[in-house]
């Protein structure tokens, strides 16, 4: 079973006001206790770690605790270069957000359409995808079964013949394929990016008021000066009280975003897991310039 190691950084400002608190801080830093617990299907090691740890100390911690191929590291902030670099140098697997973002893409789409008071059944969805992985194929199938039309933009069209045949044979659904850099996305209102990187995406002529739901781990930005649409790089969610209470009891709820916490729970579950089991709701969407307002989404979706 995969294990999730939660790296919690100690806020030393809470300890350094008085000499006695300094002693408490250093004692806690040296004699941290690993709390090993289970939540859902995930085993958790609650490991406090300082943001000012030097590289050697981080390596020592990882060497002792992560001597297993089945361990995934999850930090409060993987933009912490020290932690991120050590993870890569030591080839230690860390939890990425791509799986959860893909699973949420349909819910994000429904959230956007609900703001506009439109139905997914009346919407054409364009999907950027390179690989026919299980989860990518699953997302394509689920969207195709609900949307008015689905167009797949890929330079590996041959990889999607099986999903094309399945959708047509079992559901009578025909999907479109395209890889024209000038035409594929030039009139596309809704684009879901499953696995294109920023460089590849910017090779295409993109409709200047498109809404792009980005599912890859890195933020993307459209380089065209004509582009005045929306790129959704992140999302704020909520989930049911039961799961919330479990994370509160572990002391994790206030230290990690709900998106990250849900991702850790779903890591061991089948990609077909219904996230509605956790009563997941979209609260806010975020782009390159911060939170995206509902009025902004409404504007971009209606004008063409």
Regions found by a protein language model. Give the residues of each.
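Structural motif
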Residues: 6-10, 48-50, 75-79, 128-131, ...
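Adenosine-phosphate binding glycine-rich loop
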Residues: 217-304
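A short, well-structured beta->alpha microelement
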Residues: 26-33, 52-54, 164, 168-185, ...
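Rossmann-like adenosine-cofactor binding region
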Residues: 174-243
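Glycine-rich phosphate/diphosphate-binding loop of Rossmann-like nucleotide-binding domains
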Residues: 115-182
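Metallocofactor- and cofactor-centric catalytic cores in central/energy metabolism, strongly enriched
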Residues: 6-17, 27-86, 110, 291-304
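A glycine-rich, Thr/Ser-enriched phosphate-binding loop motif common to dinucleotide/cofactor-binding enzymes
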Residues: 93-111
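Short, charged/polar "capping" segments at the starts of alpha-helices
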Residues: 79-85, 136, 157-164, 199-201, ...
């Amino acid at each position: 079973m995969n294990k999730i190691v939660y790296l919690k950084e100690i806020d030393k400002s809470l300890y350094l006001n008085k000499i006695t608190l300094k002693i408490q801080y250093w004692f806690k830093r040296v004699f941290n206790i690993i709390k090993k617990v289970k939540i859902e299907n995930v085993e958790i090691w609650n490991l406090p770690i300082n943001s000012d740890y030097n590289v050697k100390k981080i390596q020592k911690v990882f060497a002792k605790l992560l001597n297993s191929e089945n361990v995934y590291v999850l930090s409060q902030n993987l933009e912490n270069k020290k932690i991120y670099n050590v993870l890569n140098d030591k080839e230690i697997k860390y939890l990425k957000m791509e799986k959860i973002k893909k699973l949420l893409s349909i819910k994000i789409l429904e959230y956007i359409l609900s703001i506009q008071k439109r139905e997914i059944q009346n919407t054409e969805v364009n999907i950027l995808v390179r690989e026919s992985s299980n989860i990518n194929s699953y997302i394509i199938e689920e969207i195709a079964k609900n949307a008015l039309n689905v167009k797949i933009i890929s330079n590996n069209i041959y990889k999607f013949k099986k999903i094309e045949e399945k959708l047509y044979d079992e559901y009578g659904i025909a999907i479109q394929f395209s890889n024209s850099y000038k035409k594929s996305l030039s009139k596309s209102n809704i684009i879901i990016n499953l696995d294109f990187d920023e460089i590849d995406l910017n090779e295409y002529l993109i409709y200047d008021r498109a809404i792009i739901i980005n599912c890859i781990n890195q933020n993307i930005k459209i380089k065209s000066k004509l582009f005045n649409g929306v790129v959704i790089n992140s999302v704020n969610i909520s989930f049911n009280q039961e799961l919330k209470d479990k994370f509160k009891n572990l002391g994790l709820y206030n230290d990690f975003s709900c998106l990250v916490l849900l991702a850790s729970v779903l890591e061991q579950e089948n990609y077909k897991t219904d996230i509605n089991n956790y009563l997941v709701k979209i609260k806010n969407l975020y782009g390159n310039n911060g939170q995206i307002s509902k009025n902004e989404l409404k504007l971009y979706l209606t004008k063409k």
